[in-house]
């Protein structure tokens, strides 16, 4: 089992798909990494040699921000917005949509489950 960036990659999947299990690596980045290292897109993780896994690990460590570092960066960016008390920061703080979506209806993902209001029947 290949372990890259603290993530155990599934051995029976193709390399491109398995790399997307790492937070911060999508399909495009996975294809770019495979092309850079000359790894065939159809190869399975279990067919990779230890040297190839090491190459992938070194490439990801050198060129990409992944997993914990990426999560930390994202959290720090949101915290910075909240500390600035700018509009986006206030929306984050209140748990409302940040990017201008409507909230009169919908927005249930950010607002949570609907709370009934007494005497609101028509």
UniProtKB/Swiss-Prot annotation:
Keywords: Ribonucleoprotein, Ribosomal protein, RNA-binding, rRNA-binding, tRNA-binding. GO terms for molecular function: rRNA binding; structural constituent of ribosome; tRNA binding. Residues 95-122 are annotated as: Disordered. One of its GO terms (cellular component) is small ribosomal subunit. The keyword Lipid metabolism does not apply. The keyword Ubl conjugation does not apply. InterPro entries: Rbsml_uS13_C, Ribosomal_uS13, Ribosomal_uS13-like_H2TH, Ribosomal_uS13_bac-type, Ribosomal_uS13_CS. Part of the 30S ribosomal subunit. Forms a loose heterodimer with protein S19. Forms two bridges to the 50S subunit in the 70S ribosome. Located at the top of the head of the 30S subunit, it contacts several helices of the 16S rRNA. In the 70S ribosome it contacts the 23S rRNA (bridge B1a) and protein L5 of the 50S subunit (bridge B1b), connecting the 2 subunits; these bridges are implicated in subunit movement. Contacts the tRNAs in the A and P-sites. Belongs to the universal ribosomal protein uS13 family. This is Small ribosomal subunit protein uS13. It comes from Sphingopyxis alaskensis (strain DSM 13593 / LMG 18877 / RB2256). The lineage of its organism: Bacteria, Pseudomonadati, Pseudomonadota, Alphaproteobacteria, Sphingomonadales. The gene is rpsM.
């Amino acid at each position: 089992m290949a372990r890259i960036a603290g993530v155990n990659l599934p051995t029976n999947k193709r390399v491109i798909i398995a790399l997307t299990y790492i937070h911060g690596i999508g399909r495009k980045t996975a294809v770019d990494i495979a092309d850079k290292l000359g790894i065939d897109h159809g190869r399975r993780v279990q067919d990779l040699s230890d040297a190839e896994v090491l190459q992938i690990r070194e490439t990801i460590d050198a060129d990409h921000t992944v997993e914990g570092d990426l999560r930390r960066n994202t959290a720090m960016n949101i915290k910075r917005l909240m500390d600035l008390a700018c509009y986006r920061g206030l929306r984050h703080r209140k748990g409302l949509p940040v990017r201008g979506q409507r909230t009169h209806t919908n927005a249930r993902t950010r607002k949570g489950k609907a709370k009934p209001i007494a005497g609101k029947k028509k």
